[in-house]
Amino acid sequence: MEERRSRMGLNSPTSKVAYAGGTVTGAAGTSILDPATGRPVGASDPYFLEVNHELSDKGFFVAAADDLITWARTGSLMWMTFGLACCAVEMMQVSMPRYDVERFGFAPRASPRQSDVMIVAGTLTNKMAPALRKVYDQMPEPRYVISMGSCANGGGYYHYSYSVVRGCDRIVPVDIYVPGCPPTAEALLYGILLLQKKIRRVGTIER
């Protein structure tokens, strides 16, 4: 096995590993290069350019506490799984290696008291509605809700059923709606990124 790895060049401390988004260089993948420019990903981002300028000029930079807290929160969102139907399959898929939502700082938690986001995935029935509200009330502030799929958004296929809530927004306030029946894992991932964008725009200290 070691001989095979040596022939492939994987034992070299400066080996390069190619992947869809660019090239990882170094023993532990110290930098991710953009194949179009050859520079590290995000090097031309105005935010990082300003930070680099401040650090090179003063050795430190001054930022508002709200901006710092918002930055930390968007990179450490813990989500509470609330799978109610087939949408939960796609919700689980977004955590698998193909999408790996944890690389965006979005990790699952089994307790509502440790969660920032609730993903309502599937059909919400009248009997389940009090449990949904109870779990939501146990989440610490600020808390967010992603409504995933047509059934959670508005009842979906069971809209006219006597036993189904016509949208989970009748029970809890919803921040992001992800359409589809069921939505793909890519759609949910896009909704998560939109939630992070909303948090950066609105802030987290007062809500």
UniProtKB/Swiss-Prot annotation:
- Where is it mostly found? membrane
| Oligomeric and partner information | NDH-1 is composed of 14 different subunits. Subunits NuoB, C, D, E, F, and G constitute the peripheral sector of the complex.
Q: Which gene encodes it?
A: nuoB
For this UniProt record, the keywords arranged alphabetically read as follows: 4Fe-4S, Cell inner membrane, Cell membrane, Iron, Iron-sulfur, Membrane, Metal-binding, NAD, Quinone, Translocase, Transport, Ubiquinone
Q: PROSITE patterns annotated for this entry?
A: COMPLEX1_20K (PS01150)
Tell me how this protein sits in the membrane: Peripheral membrane protein
Report the subcellular localization: Cell inner membrane
UniProt-recorded name of the protein: NADH-quinone oxidoreductase subunit B
Q: Which residues make up the binding site for [4Fe-4S] cluster? A: 86-87, 151, 181
Q: Which GO terms describe its biological process?
A: aerobic respiration; electron transport coupled proton transport
Naming one, the record's GO cellular component terms include: plasma membrane
Q: Name one GO molecular function term.
A: iron ion binding
Stated EC number for the protein is 7.1.1.-
Give the cofactor binding note.
Binds 1 [4Fe-4S] cluster.
Q: Which NCBIfam families match?
A: nuoB_fam, PRK06411.1
Q: Does the keyword Repeat apply?
A: no
Which family is annotated? Belongs to the complex I 20 kDa subunit family.
The role this protein plays is: NDH-1 shuttles electrons from NADH, via FMN and iron-sulfur (Fe-S) centers, to quinones in the respiratory chain. The immediate electron acceptor for the enzyme in this species is believed to be ubiquinone. Couples the redox reaction to proton translocation (for every two electrons transferred, four hydrogen ions are translocated across the cytoplasmic membrane), and thus conserves the redox energy in a proton gradient.
Which cysteines share a disulfide bond? none
The record's InterPro entries line, in alphabetical order, gives:
NADH_UbQ_OxRdtase-like_20kDa (IPR006137), NADH_UQ_OxRdtase_20Kd_su (IPR006138)
- Chemical reaction(s) catalysed: a quinone + NADH + 5 H(+)(in) = a quinol + NAD(+) + 4 H(+)(out)
Q: Which cofactor does it need?
A: [4Fe-4S] cluster
Which Pfam families does its entry note?
Oxidored_q6
Q: Which SUPFAM superfamilies match?
A: HydA/Nqo6-like (SSF56770)
